[in-house]
Amino acid sequence: MSSCSTSTKPETGSLSGKVILVNDTGDPALDPIDYSGITVALYNLAYLDTTIVRINNKYPQIGVHINQETEFDHRYQQPVAKTITNTDGSFKLIEIISGEYNLVYFKSGWGIRYVYNIVINKGENIISDINAQITDNHKISNMDEGSKAKITELVLYPMKYLSSTIQNAYVFQEDHCYLITQDTSFLSSVVFQNSAFGFVNPGCRIDFWNSVSMPESGKRWWITSSEGIFTSELNIPGDDDNVLKIRIANYDGNIIRNGKISNLMDGLEINSDDTIITKMVFTNGFTAIVLNGNNLNINQTLIKSFKSRTNVFYGNSNISQNIFYNNYDNLIIDSSDFNVNNNYFISNWVGIRPIYGNTIIRNNCFWNNVYGISMLASNPLIEYNEFFESKRYCIQTQPNYVQVYFDHCNPVINHNNIYAINQIAISIKPDAHDGYYASGGVGVINDIDATYNYWRAIDIDNVLYDELDSDIIHYKILFNPRINAKILSAGIQ
């Protein structure tokens, strides 16, 4: 008796189309001879992190809803298929397993474009007949690209190379690409239109000295490192060599919105007042944002995968409805009176690090951070938050040595849901080897008010580190009276 098995080959299809080069500069020297030599490549969809998708679904009012536009960068993948256009711009990709992909096409000197969520069916697929969408199943607030729309043609425009100083008002045009090869200053107003791409060579800085504006909705503009942008193969930009720094100064009241900034080292620096950063995506790099000013607001923004200090803030500002994910020394608030509310801090080394000042930390969610809040000589009000699964401490205090004496912390910790069972919830002495600023000294000079909280632990002393745990600590963490039921008004509202 014998048996045999057969394997079914997956259904495959082809994709054909045409890319044209359009010289809209008015310079006849840039007129193309033909449309050959354009690279066309097909990539698997970017992975949508299930952690962020879960937060998007549970709290749709915070952060940015991720999709292919926010997550896809062709430099992080090998292509599924690729080819080069003929003289008339035509191309054909063959033997593609049926499914959904992202299409990338580029030519040196002519920029690069992405088309998201291309569906390849069995048999022949022609680009002009294919429906594509930019947001897949996760909608972006105030965007109307969720419905599928016909692609009539693929177009590339000449790359624009920017000089070191631009005196007049400047527009980053829709669907155009810009390469910055040296430090560049914009002295007059700047407009970013939808889907404008700016590529900055490693080591370069961009300064905006006047107003900067961009649309409230529509396709996102993007600023990133130029490293590896014009190759179809895997070529992840190296953060160590990229000193890309974007500085906005001298003009109050800018609204930075609806864009994506990636692969930074020194980050976006704001040196002006009344600036709003909203509906932005910052990803992959060292420092995301440095704020130097007053009345600054960051809201409905996603900041993820930064390897060093993610944010350094000075001045008085409001940080609300953001997602901070997978960063290192995450939200540093230095010498400031900040209001930090309705944010989700997840899988960071440090969620918030207040340094001096009287920060209000209210209605946030801290999940799976090594340290939820690690304060240094600060007096924050910590209320109506939720703390889940901190790997070391939910909250710790640290002193700061100034010349011949120590400055200490005096937090007020009330009305929080604290779910710590197998780790320390609150410690008033930091671990000297792990905390970035940790001195090993006791962080307070008085008892700490941690009353009116809900505790999952039955024996609360087991999740505290105070005078009962060390001979050098002479102060208590006061937890009575306590709340016996989960506080419904705590956490993100």
Q: Residue locations for each model-derived region?
A:
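Structured interaction patches on ligand/partner-binding surfaces of diverse proteins
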Residues: 106-138
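Extracellular beta-rich repeat passengers
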Residues: 142-493
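Short, flexible loop/turn segments at beta-strand junctions in immunoglobulin-like
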Residues: 93-95
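Bacterial Sec-dependent N-terminal signal peptides
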Residues: 1-25, 154
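A glycine-anchored, Pro-Gly-centered beta-turn/N-cap motif
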Residues: 97-99, 176
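Conserved "repeat-terminator" motif of extracellular CCP/Sushi domains
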Residues: 8-10, 128-141, 145, 154
